[in-house]
From Swiss-Prot:
Protein name, UniProt field: 5-hydroxyisourate hydrolase
Reaction(s) catalysed (UniProt annotation): 5-hydroxyisourate + H2O = 5-hydroxy-2-oxo-4-ureido-2,5-dihydro-1H-imidazole-5-carboxylate + H(+)
Keywords, in A-Z order: Hydrolase, Purine metabolism
Function: Catalyzes the hydrolysis of 5-hydroxyisourate (HIU) to 2-oxo-4-hydroxy-4-carboxy-5-ureidoimidazoline (OHCU).
Transmembrane stretches, start-end: none
CDD domains linked: TLP_HIUase
Assembly mode: Homotetramer.
Species in which this protein is naturally found: Deinococcus radiodurans (strain ATCC 13939 / DSM 20539 / JCM 16871 / CCUG 27074 / LMG 4051 / NBRC 15346 / NCIMB 9279 / VKM B-1422 / R1)
């Protein structure tokens, strides 16, 4: 995995069968009750951020939160509820092996979501 970045994400809209462009993503490091902002990005036309959220050499062990602001994305579609059912989706996960690549995608519809550790 020597060429892989440390932490990346990808947002897929399975209701429309497309990558979700324009979703604001925030990354925080969590220590106890404290959330420290690391970076913020917006997904591109492929549903990915233009750069890794954390480069491989900068990834540290610990707990992180990815927060996806999905309500604004779903407001643009007639099929979505008004107001949208999902507003913000937060995924909390732990990094143990900093030599690996952590790809944490969000797979969503206007009414549900899922995630997994991808490659």
């Amino acid at each position: 995995m020597s060429g892989h970045p440390g932490l990346t994400t990808h947002v897929l809209d399975t209701a429309r069968g497309k990558p979700a462009a324009g979703v604001r993503v925030q990354l925080c490091r969590v220590t106890g009750d404290t959330r420290t902002p690391v970076t913020e990005a917006v997904t591109n036309s492929d549903g990915r951020t233009d750069a890794p959220l954390i480069e491989r050499g900068s990834l540290k062990q610990g707990t992180y939160e990815l927060t996806f602001h999905v309500a604004d994305y779903f407001k643009g579609f007639v099929a979505a509820a008004d107001p949208p059912f999902l507003d913000v989706v937060t995924l909390r996960f732990t990094v143990g092996d900093t030599s690996g690549h952590y790809h944490v995608p969000l797979v969503m519809t206007p009414w549900s979501y899922s995630t997994y550790r991808g490659s």
